[in-house]
Amino acid sequence: AASDVYKRQIMDDPFYDDALVKSSFDDEGVPCKTKAVVEKGVFNGLLHSLKTAHYFHVAPTGNGFKMSTAGSISTEPTNLFIKEGNLSKDEIISTVEEGIYITEVNGLHAGLNPISGDFNVQSSGYMIKNGKIDKPITLFVTSGNFFEMMKNIEAIGNDIEKRFVGVASPTLKVKSLAISGK
């Protein structure tokens, strides 16, 4: 059931075995540590740099990083991911009568509201028909709400993909999202 899947964990793990980058310390010299951001469906707390930790009167979490040598410190994940499930990507796809397998999203920096969770991102991927990958599709927009999407996850794959530094995800089967485009 979707409610069982929602009880999975969202982790921030600077030492994740297959991570593209591992960090013992953040750029402020604070030790990095493994954190369950969401555990059993319950939000455990924010990631913090020294500045945000001071503002909220909490301990820093080792998440103060510079995006460039000239940049300022911001709060960033080390390796943020939804903990993998037990189904293969092919097993998940085989359960979809008609849908879309999204392989890429662009514009998260501009198309995601971190407060409300609303998102609107350019996407590309493949049509799924009768449980099989069909034709490729590009330049469509995927819209929804992150928190609602998390509640509507029906299956989690065992195939974490590390495509970006700092963020990874296994294949997710989501009940529905809004799609627009040709």
Identify the function of each model-found stretch:
Residues S3-K182:
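N-terminal small-residue-enriched
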